[in-house]
Structures are given as C-alpha cells and as structure tokens.
A protein has these predicted regions:
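Membrane-proximal transmembrane or re-entrant/amphipathic helices at the cytosolic face
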Residues: 166-170, 193-248
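Membrane-interface helix-loop junctions in multi-pass transport and translocation proteins
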Residues: 113, 120-155, 159, 169-172, ...
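Interfacial/gating helices of multi-pass transporter permease domains
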Residues: 1-12, 78-84
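Helix-loop junctions and terminal segments of transmembrane helices
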Residues: 7, 11-49, 103-108
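Short alpha-helical transmembrane segments in multi-pass integral membrane proteins
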Residues: 8, 44, 49-64, 140-165
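Interfacial segments at transmembrane-helix termini and the short loops linking adjacent helices
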Residues: 63-94, 167
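Membrane-interface junctions at transmembrane-helix termini in multi-pass inner-membrane proteins
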Residues: 90-122, 136
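Short membrane-interface helical motifs at transmembrane helix boundaries
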Residues: 58-77, 132, 136, 194-199
Length: 248
C-alpha cells in the first residue's frame, strides 16, 4: 500500500492539471444544458472530449514511461513496481483522464442521481475482483480490478444515459473515439519504451532530461493528432486566459 501511494500521488499530480481546466467549465456547461439544443450540447461535449484526449496522451504516456524512473531517483530502485503493476496504474490513470468530460457533464446535469446505484455496483464489483485478482496477481491484480470494475459498470452506462437524455444521439462515435485514442497511446508508449530502453536514469539531471524529451515528443504527437479539433481550441483559449491573468 505504501509503494502504491507513491505512484498514486504522481498520477494525481499529473491529472490535477486537466482537472483544474475542466472543473472551471462546470458553470458554462450548465448554461449549455439549460439553453442550447441537443446538437449544440453534443458539439461542446465532443470538443471537451477531444481536449481530454490530448491531455490523456501526454499525461498517461508520460506516467507510463517515467513513473519508475521518478521513483528510482526520488526514493530508490527498491521502491519501484514491476512493469505489470505500472501498466495497471497507467490504465487507471488513463480512465481517470478520459472520463473527465463525462464527469463534468454528470455534475452539470445532475445525472449522478440516476447513476448512484451503478456506482454502488461498480464498488461491489471492484471489491470482489480485488479479492480474486489480488490472490493471483498481487497488487497489480487489485489495481486492474478497479479498471475492470469501471469498464463493466459506469463506463458504458453513464455515456448511454447522457447521450440518450441530453444529446438525442447514440454512443457509437464516443466509444470509437476512445478506442482510437487508446490505440494511438499504446503505439506511442510501445515505440518510446523501445527507443528509451537503453536510457538509464541515475540522477536528477538525467531524469529531468528524459522528462523534457518525453514531454516534448508526446506533446508533439498528440497535438498534431488533435490540432484540428475544437478541443484543441478549448485548451488554447484556457491557456490564453491563464497567461492573460498572469500578465496583469
């Protein structure tokens, strides 16, 4: 548990960037839900989702590629997890990132009142799977159980409810977009893992250099992949607002 808390802290710090940006949109989304047509609501949601895909690519790839290096330099190699466990934490990090727009809409629409029993079901599934997978896979199994519980319950139920009640649309395109993002992300992590396989991090200087290179490469790939989407414009507008407030 102590080892996992270190990885969880790293994951949460990375996710905080996206959470700050998206949480500031809750009031605006409430106005969209109250005033605009289902088509406009869907358009705004898709813009937020494509923005989250950029964050997902950078945050999740960065975590998967660098988590063990950070822990090694920070605490020592004896405090690192196996690659299987890092993958499990990375999967959970991805879903926490990719589901941000859905959670924002859930809060803005009050949809959580209709999903509370599904959330309870997810918790029960998580507990059962944690016991089963934990016996066979250790800490990795317990962490994977959380991801499986999400996938088997509210991951499919909440979008179905949101799209049906507020967008008058099917969820097919939503799931396809997530699969495409996962595919691109998996390719990026696999290729960079191979490219960086000979890069041994031994101190803070080599770690910082690897972080900078990883961030630059991942940012370039995912910005290029989504730069034509409305979500990219959402990010740029928020960056301009932050820079504008800072400059005053």
């Amino acid at each position: 548990v102590g080892l996992y808390s270190n990885y969880l802290m790293l994951s949460n710090k990375l996710l905080l960037i996206e959470q700050i940006i998206f949480s500031s949109l809750v009031a605006s989304i409430g106005n969209v839900i109250a005033r605009d047509s289902p088509e406009k609501r869907l358009q705004i949601f898709q813009a937020m989702q494509s923005a989250s895909f950029i964050f997902c690519g950078i945050i999740t790839a960065g975590f998967g590629l660098l988590a063990n290096d950070v822990i090694t330099v920070w605490l020592g190699k004896e405090y690192t997890f196996s690659m299987l466990t890092v993958i499990a934490v990375t999967v959970n990090t991805y879903f926490s990132c990719a589901l941000q727009p859905l959670w924002i809409y859930r809060d803005a629409t009050g949809l959580y009142m209709k999903t509370k029993y599904m959330m309870l079901a997810g918790s029960i599934v998580n507990i059962v799977l944690s016991v089963i997978l934990g016996r066979f896979m250790g800490i990795a199994g317990i962490i994977f159980a959380s991801a499986i519980a999400r996938l088997s319950t509210y991951f499919w139920y909440e979008p179905k409810l949101l799209f049906h009640e507020y967008f008058n649309s099917r969820t097919t395109g939503y799931y396809i977009s997530i699969l495409k993002n996962i595919g691109l992300l998996a390719c990026v992590i696999a290729v960079l893992s191979y490219v960086f396989s000979g890069w041994v991090v031994t101190d803070w200087m080599t770690l910082i250099l690897k972080v900078v290179v990883t961030a630059a490469v991942c940012s370039s790939i995912f910005v290029l992949a989504y730069c034509r989407t409305e979500g990219f414009q959402v990010i740029m507008n928020k960056v301009r607002q932050i820079c504008g407030h800072t400059g005053r």
